[in-house]
Regions:
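Catalytic cores and adjacent flexible loops of soluble metabolic enzymes
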Residues: 1-241
Length: 241
């Protein structure tokens, strides 16, 4: 039985290569299949490997086989995965994806999802997943273990749209005003204004000045610099200094 399955899975790999595929996906169930991993590794193409049911030690062993057989570490993407259909949310353990990333510098990480809905793969994207795998079906009511945890066409479209929006939202990490919000700066911020009518030569105090919108005048951050200085002109109540 082993020899039959062994030959079949090797034939499938050869078939996929004959079709011109440039990336091969190793399913969770094959992560401990040494001959299979060695064959994939010798090809030297890009590899995605799922890690359902595996611990860090088994992942390390699989990566060692692949790299020692010829696959470059930077060409490997490791998908965190839970092989339960559907996966309970409390068993997802998305933080394990970050553990994998930290444990194996140089690899890419992603997430293979078997939960219901699209929330978890979207969250994985926000956490740094570079690849998302989600099962697809035309009808969730069909028989078989995968269909219930799969997405129908409209759901898949919604997931992809949400992921693309998250990718746009990640940004550069530099904290500065965005072009879209700059126009709101003078509206939302405040300036120092006269709390009542102020005469020329009068001393500015906490009783005759206050802070109000818009933010087109002197910033309230200069409050201490204004207090106890002398007014150079007359001000009406609410007038910007």
């Amino acid at each position: 039985m082993f020899s039959i399955r062994y030959s079949l899975i090797f034939c499938i790999v050869d078939l996929l290569l004959s079709l011109g595929l440039e990336i091969l996906k190793i399913p969770s169930g094959e992560i401990t299949n040494l001959p299979y991993l060695r064959k994939i590794g010798k090809i030297g193409c890009k590899v995605i490997i799922s890690t359902g049911m595996a611990d860090l030690g088994e992942i390390e062993d699989a990566l060692d086989v692949l790299t020692q057989s010829g696959t470059k570490l930077e060409d490997i993407t490791v998908l965190h995965c839970n092989t339960e259909y559907p996966t309970p949310f409390e068993d997802v353990n998305l933080n394990a994806m970050l553990t994998i990333k930290k444990a194996f510098p140089g690899i890419k990480v992603g997430y293979s999802d078997h939960t219901l809905g699209i929330e978890v793969p979207v969250a994985a994207t926000a956490m740094g997943a570079e690849v998302i795998e989600k099962h697809f079906t035309l009808d969730k009511s069909m028989k078989g273990p995968d269909h219930r945890a799969s997405l129908e066409p409209d759901e898949l479209k919604a997931m992809v749209k949400a992921i693309r929006n998250i990718e746009k939202s990640m940004g550069t990490g530099i904290k500065k005003p965005s072009p879209s919000e700059l126009k709101n700066k003078p509206i939302a911020r405040k300036s120092i204004v006269a709390a009542r009518d102020i005469k020329k030569g009068e001393i500015f105090t906490e009783d005759n000045i206050t802070v109000k919108r818009p933010g087109t005048g002197i910033s309230p951050m200069q409050w201490d610099e204004i207090i106890n200085t002398i007014s150079s002109k007359n001000y009406q109540e609410d007038e910007l200094l």
